[in-house]
Amino acid sequence: MKTFVAKPETVKRDWYVVDAEGKTLGRLASEIASRLRGKHKAEYTPHVDTGDYIIVINAEKVAVTGNKAKNKVYYRHSEFPGGLKSITFEKLIDRKPEMALELAVKGMLPRGPLGRAMYRKLKVYAGAEHNHVAQQPQVLDI
């Protein structure tokens, strides 16, 4: 019996919508990353993008445990001397609510072209509305 290898042109991708309200950031992000990779499917192949599209709504209401709202810090650098910027989770949620979940999921995906293709299938919205009604997404309870 030969080993099955999924072909990119034969992969069937579904659309799912996830409500992030009250969910813990890391636990939600790990499940989303797993589904973006396609690990929940029987035809999962590591070098082929077999994952589904994931729409996340209410990203502004995602929760973190303990004191992480005040203590968790996100860093970025402009590549110029003295260009290190930092922002806490609390301020990040106020300014760009989608960004915290996007960064958490992106860190759980592989690096390189395949990981970028998987990341492009993630759609995150701060509020309860999304503009992917035409794709008829199924509700995914995580």
From Swiss-Prot:
**Signal peptide coordinates:** none
Q: Which CDD domains match?
A: Ribosomal_L13
For this UniProt record, the keywords arranged alphabetically read as follows: Ribonucleoprotein, Ribosomal protein
Q: Which Pfam families match?
A: Ribosomal_L13 (PF00572)
**Biological processes per GO annotation:** negative regulation of translation; translation
Q: Which InterPro entries match?
A: Ribosomal_uL13, Ribosomal_uL13_bac-type, Ribosomal_uL13_CS, Ribosomal_uL13_sf
Q: List the disulfide bonds.
A: none
Q: Which domain of life is it from?
A: Bacteria
Q: How is this protein annotated for GO cellular component?
A: cytosolic large ribosomal subunit
Q: Which GO terms describe its molecular function?
A: mRNA binding; structural constituent of ribosome
Q: Which HAMAP family match?
A: Ribosomal_uL13
Q: Which PANTHER family match?
A: LARGE RIBOSOMAL SUBUNIT PROTEIN UL13M (PTHR11545:SF2), RIBOSOMAL PROTEIN L13 (PTHR11545)
Family indicated by similarity: Belongs to the universal ribosomal protein uL13 family.
Q: What function does the entry list?
A: This protein is one of the early assembly proteins of the 50S ribosomal subunit, although it is not seen to bind rRNA by itself. It is important during the early stages of 50S assembly.
Assembly with partners or alone: Part of the 50S ribosomal subunit.
NCBIfam families assigned: rplM_bact (TIGR01066)
Q: What is this protein called?
A: Large ribosomal subunit protein uL13
Task: Supply the gene name.
Answer: rplM
